[in-house]
Design a protein with these regions (language model features):
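Short amphipathic alpha-helix that is part of the acyltransferase structural core
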Residues: 1-30
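Conserved beta-strand in the GNAT
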Residues: 28, 34-45, 58-63
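A conserved beta-turn-beta hairpin within the catalytic core of GNAT-like acetyltransferases
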Residues: 44-59, 69, 88-90
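A short, internal acetyl-CoA/4′-phosphopantetheine-binding micro-motif in the GNAT/acyltransferase core
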Residues: 59-69, 96-97
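Conserved acetyl-CoA-binding loop-helix of GNAT-fold acetyltransferases
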Residues: 64, 70-83, 105-109
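Conserved GNAT acetyl-CoA-binding A-motif
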Residues: 85-97
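Conserved beta-strand-loop-alpha-helix junction that forms the acyl-donor binding cleft
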Residues: 94-104, 121-123
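C-terminal "cap" of GNAT-fold acetyltransferases
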Residues: 120-140
Length: 140
C-alpha cells in the first residue's frame, strides 16, 4: 500500500471538490491501484474551524473503505500528513465530535492534547473537541 499526496486532477472528479485551492491538501492510500482511504490537511484562518480556534494546519477527514479497516491505514495516513504538515509549521490541530472515540483515540496515540471543547451543530454530540500537537511531541 502507498500513501501519497494528490493534486487537483490526479483522481478525476472523485475528489475534485476536496482540493479546490492551495489551502486544501489531499492524501490517499492506494492498494492494487485503487483508493482505499483518504485524509486531508486544511489550512484554516482563525475561527474557521469553530469559535476561538486558532489559524493553522488542521488534519481533517480520514475515511477508510470498510473492507480495508483494521489494517492501520488511518494511522499511516496520519503519520504521512503529520510529517507533511510539520515540514511547514510547528503546530498541527484537529477538530472532531466529542463522541468520535475512534478519532480521539487515533490522535491521542500521536500525542495530540485537547485544547478546548465548544458547542457545534456539526457533531451528533453537539460538542466538538479542538486538539493540538506541537512538533517536539510528534517526534517523541
Amino acid at each position: 500500500m502507498r500513501v501519497l499526496r494528490v493534486k487537483p486532477g490526479d483522481l478525476g472528479e472523485q475528489f475534485a471538490s476536496d482540493i479546490t485551492d492551495d489551502l486544501r491538501h489531499m492524501f490517499v492510500a492506494k492498494a492494487s491501484g485503487q483508493v482505499v482511504a483518504y485524509g486531508r490537511v486544511i489550512e484554516l484562518a482563525a475561527d474557521e474551524a469553530g469559535p476561538g480556534t486558532p489559524a493553522g494546519c488542521y488534519l481533517s477527514g480520514v475515511l477508510v473503505d470498510p473492507a480495508w479497516r483494521r489494517r492501520s491505514i488511518a494511522t499511516q495516513l496520519t503519520q504521512v500528513r503529520l510529517r507533511w504538515a510539520f515540514a511547514r509549521t510547528d503546530k498541527v490541530f484537529y477538530v472532531t465530535g466529542a463522541d468520535n472515540v475512534a478519532s480521539l483515540d487515533l490522535h491521542a496515540a500521536f500525542g495530540f492534547q485537547e485544547m478546548k471543547r465548544f458547542r457545534s451543530e456539526r457533531s451528533a454530540a453537539g460538542e466538538d473537541v479542538l486538539s493540538q500537537l506541537a512538533r517536539a511531541a510528534e517526534r517523541s
